[in-house]
Amino acid sequence: MFCTLTIYNGKRQKGAPTYRRPIVIRRECAGGSYDLIRARKKKGRLNIRKLEQAIGDRPVICQAGIDPPHGCRLNLFDSGRYRKLLSLNSAAAVLSIASRYKRNISVAFIDPSGQYCGFAERLMPIAESAYIITNSIESYSLCANRCYTLFGAAPVISDGYGIIEKCGVVISPDGYGVFSADKCIFAPQNEFWHVERGCIAAVDGCPEGVDEVDFAAALYECCSARRMATLAAEHMIAGGQKHTLEAIAHRICLDIR
């Protein structure tokens, strides 16, 4: 279970058991549950001890604009792994759209450690050619065998990066070169797309002001809400601008000759 945290100033709200004890509200969502915690400042100060007691060692998501209270030991939830999953889902959705218009899409998938073999299998139906760049040759050899059994074709596996120049799309969940780990899909011209706050549709039950991606990630990782594993972004970001998945797919098709 996880919790969300809101900190506010003002008079004691109805239902607060004591003057400075946080309000804890249990909520059900996506087959799991979490606690919505509202902590009130008195004269600009929080009762850190009572806040820590209310939260315990559970992962916590703070409302946007709220920094962890100074001196408060919180287990802040990290959505980094889920953001990579969301990026991969979004990349697959983009390629699926693009494949309706272009069949000659070649994709380079960079996975040095071999931890994303399952995603490589998703590339085969939507890309004419798939190239896997990895140091985990053995893991991907098994993946290639499965792909051949399922699709009659297998990705080309290599530990060299030269193939990137031949590909219309590069997908790298852990980053590539100067790009940070949240950059997932980009063209050879180094225009790339990534996910960030607000890129997915509102998740039912997400408290106001809480990042929807963080909330979906917590439901998936802490509450086993498996349907969150299939979400894709509604848009991705490039150059500070929002682009729909359809627009990204169109751009890829224009880049491919």
Label the predicted regions.
Residues 21-26, 39-50, 146-168, 175-177:
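A short, well-structured beta->alpha microelement
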Residues 7-70, 257:
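Metallocofactor- and cofactor-centric catalytic cores in central/energy metabolism, strongly enriched
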Residues 15-21, 70-76, 122-123, 141-150:
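Short, aromatic/basic amphipathic alpha-helical patches
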Residues 100-162:
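Glycine-rich phosphate/diphosphate-binding loop of Rossmann-like nucleotide-binding domains
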Residues 156-211:
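Rossmann-like adenosine-cofactor binding region
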Residues 13-14, 66-72, 116-118, 137-144, ...:
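Short, charged/polar "capping" segments at the starts of alpha-helices
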Residues 188-257:
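Adenosine-phosphate binding glycine-rich loop
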Residues 77-94:
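A glycine-rich, Thr/Ser-enriched phosphate-binding loop motif common to dinucleotide/cofactor-binding enzymes
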